[in-house]
């Protein structure tokens, strides 16, 4: 039975119109996928354009008040870094110095609090973990609130899951279409992680 089915399929596939249909369907699928991807890219770029008028919307973001705000001995952290990790209190440390509770070991000399190393004055950094740590500084609250007020409507879908200062910094420091100059080129390939209101400075190409 299997041999018979195999022979029938081979005969069908030898017919040119069958191959034409298969090719046509493949082409339609490819074009549809390409257009959808382009549509998503354009939509993201439009969302990341900051509005000109302040929006007085209520946000769930709660800002750190320093070490006293810790209510448990557990920490969330930036997770993804191979070499560095930033916890939700603003400490940045080497991954090997991360404790079992998710917090950086503050008794190690290399662990730093609210470090802006690799960051430029405009709030763009070359290392993601330093961007998050710098963004968590309490004195960045006004800057972040200003960004949220201006971008609240455009970012309501992108930031709907953000609940506090740490999650906001994680999301803000990720590279986005704001960091892109052309399709595959960063505006500033050195400092592409930004917590500030403005995108990276445009470098000549």
Curated annotation (Swiss-Prot):
Membrane topology, Cytoplasmic segments: 1-16
GO biological process, one term: positive regulation of SREBP signaling pathway
GO cellular component, one term: Golgi membrane
Predominant localisation class: Golgi
Keywords: Glycoprotein, Golgi apparatus, Membrane, Transmembrane, Transmembrane helix
Membrane-spanning intervals of the chain: 17-35
Cited function: Positively regulates hepatic SREBP signaling pathway by modulating the proper localization of SCAP (SREBP cleavage-activating protein) to the endoplasmic reticulum, thereby controlling the level of functional SCAP.
Protein name (record): SREBP regulating gene protein
Species the sequence originates in: Xenopus laevis
């Amino acid at each position: 039975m299997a041999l018979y089915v195999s022979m029938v399929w081979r005969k069908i596939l030898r017919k040119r119109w069958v191959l034409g249909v298969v090719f046509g369907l493949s082409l339609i699928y490819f074009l549809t996928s390409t257009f959808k991807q382009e549509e998503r890219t354009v939509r993201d770029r439009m969302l990341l354009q900051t509005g000109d008028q302040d929006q007085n919307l209520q946000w769930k973001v709660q800002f750190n008040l320093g070490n006293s705000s810790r209510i448990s001995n557990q920490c969330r952290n930036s997770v993804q870094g191979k070499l560095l990790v930033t916890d939700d209190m603003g400490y940045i440390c080497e991954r090997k110095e991360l404790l079992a509770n998710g917090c950086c070991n503050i008794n190690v000399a290399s662990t730093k609090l609210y470090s802006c190393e690799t960051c430029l004055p405009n709030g763009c950094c070359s290392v993601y973990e330093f961007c998050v740590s710098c963004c968590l500084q309490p004195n960045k609250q006004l800057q972040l609130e200003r960004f949220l007020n201006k971008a609240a409507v455009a970012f309501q879908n992108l930031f709907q899951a953000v609940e506090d200062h740490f999650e906001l910094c994680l999301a803000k420091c990720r590279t986005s279409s704001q960091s892109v100059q052309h399709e595959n080129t960063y505006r500033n390939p050195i400092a592409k992680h930004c917590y500030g209101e403005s995108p990276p400075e445009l470098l000549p190409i």
